[in-house]
């Protein structure tokens, strides 16, 4: 059974997950590895990776998912904010909405991913203003926590998710 690993990665986090999948799956069965592309549609099973934008997969990934029909799909992604299972499930549910009903989701995985330093700088600039949102300290703390992700534990959990 052929497979493709299709991913969109703005900061390299999702690319790291895609590379981990590529290392774990049989190389001879892989017909495509890379950014969303029609060439991947030849595969029976698609591992589709994304970065989170406004609570769902990025636009390129959502457009690609809409092209899938009768495929087995494993979704994987990263999100800079949060590390809670309910938050990740909400993102995955919003992403699954792009899939046609003829597809079968065979699994999914999400983890936190590091964000560009410009995000922290924006939070710090906001905090310097007299009237700022009250949760900026929590946002900065989350940014700092995300710096090590995806980490070795995340990659191991991904490996387990595809077994």
PLM segments and residue spans:
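Structured loop/turn residues at beta-strand edges in well-structured enzyme cores
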Residues: 1, 41, 103
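N-terminal beta-loop-helix "entrance" segment that forms/cooperates
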Residues: 15, 19, 37-52
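N-terminal beta1-alpha1 ligand-phosphate binding loop
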Residues: 2-24
């Amino acid at each position: 059974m052929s497979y493709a690993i299709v991913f969109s990665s703005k900061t390299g986090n999702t690319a790291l997950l895609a590379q981990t999948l590529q290392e774990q799956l049989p190389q001879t069965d892989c017909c495509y590895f890379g950014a969303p592309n029609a060439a991947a549609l030849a595969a029976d099973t698609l591992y589709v990776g994304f970065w989170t934008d406004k609570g769902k997969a990025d636009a390129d990934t959502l457009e690609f998912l809409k092209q899938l029909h009768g495929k087995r799909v494993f979704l994987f992604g990263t999100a800079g904010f949060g590390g809670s299972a309910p938050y990740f499930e909400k993102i995955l549910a919003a992403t699954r909405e792009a899939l046609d009903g003829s597809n079968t989701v065979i699994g999914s995985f999400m983890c936190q991913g590091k964000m560009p330093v410009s995000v922290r700088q924006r939070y710090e600039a906001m905090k310097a203003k007299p009237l700022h949102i009250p949760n900026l300290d929590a946002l900065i703390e989350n940014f700092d926590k995300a710096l090590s992700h995806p980490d070795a534990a995340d990659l191991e959990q991904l490996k387990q998710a595809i077994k």
